[in-house]
Amino acid sequence: MGSYSDNTPAIHDLAQKMISNSMIDTSLYSKYNVKRGLRDLDGKGVLTGLTDISTIIQNKEVDGKLVPCDGELYYRGYNVNDIVGGILEDDRFGFEEVVYLLLFGEMPNVAQLKDFKDLLVKYRTLPQNFVRDVILKAPSEDMMNSIARSVLTLFCYDDNPNDTSVDNVLRQCIQLISVFPMLSVYGYHAYNHYLRDKSLYIHRAEPTMSTAEVILSLLRPDRKYTPLEAKVLDMALILHMEHGGGNNSTFTTHVVTSSGTDTYSATAAALASLKGPKHGGANVKVFYMFEDIKKHIKDWKDDEEIEDYLEKILEKQTFDRMGLIYGMGHAVYTISDPRQIILKGAVQKLAKAEGYDEDFELYERVERLAPQVIGKKRKIYKGVASNVDFYSGLLYSMLDIPCELYTPMFATARIAGWSAHRLEEIVNVGKIIRPAYMSISTMKDYTPLEKR
């Protein structure tokens, strides 16, 4: 009797049949002006909706023409550079404050922020025995699947899971934002213990801790962390919280929400999207790529040797043979990703404190050389610059966050943006999202079964 997961010869034969009858002539996309990926060749997205949650600027008008510019990102009209700068100047944690901003559209005052933090702490608890019965009893080797399963199971513990009124959805969203750190870290501990035979420890979240502190304290055996570590993680969370309505996972949130489904299902769908290596899964790909580079390059300061190896990566001769230099390029930004610029400064500071100077310098060299290599080897329609994923893997590794949690860290931040967009979709009572697909099928006469 074969395993549940076996791909048998029969399945292979059926797969080949499916492929032969499913291929579409790529020239037809141009013929019918299909916007593959809902984007033009220059990367400009097809306008499918309106949002007041965030603003992304990648070009500006000069002499009546749009020209690429350094990227800018605004949360509810506030420049992210200013938000992060203000938080750094005050030497405080800011994730919870920015969650408030994204959800409610305005900056909280001191009293409002305190009340909101208290609300997050109140909801930072899972149902009785949930960790034992749901997370520990069915560990997964993929943390994104573990989180999605936990989110869907929370539906069963909610007395009003299908109520899509604004009040109820807001309550559900705040609860999910509060428990995502625990779903992520506890899921990892279950995997680490039951599938890797490591020690198991489950810490409780302290009510006085920020979200970044909760993550580090739950993850580490001794619960210890430095203020710098927690502040840098807090910044990374802020920079990953939101990025417009058109990114794959947030657009998924809009699409699924427009059907009228519940919050848990919409969030699970967004998680499934973010898991993909072309979206949130790219950060761990960057880290693995650099681990491969370190193994194969003798002199980390030799530009020529680095260029040669990057060319091999592009030509599918090494690493994962996908032909991609991960962390380079973005669907929207052309010249620079503002999140990457902010994060890079924090990563450099942490690298110096933790003794990762040589690693950081290697990342900088690849960041400088990769656009040149891509420009020589590929036909590109817009500029190529490093994105926020480029340095995030190095950051997480310096924080001793395991690779299995890289994308869940992204999700722990982005749940705030997903929640804001879900609420925006509900408040504005939009139509169900249903774009057009053109059929290119050839009409055929039906043949009775015995005559085929």
Predicted regions and their residues:
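Non-transmembrane, aqueous-exposed alpha-helical and coiled segments at domain scale
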Residues: 1-452
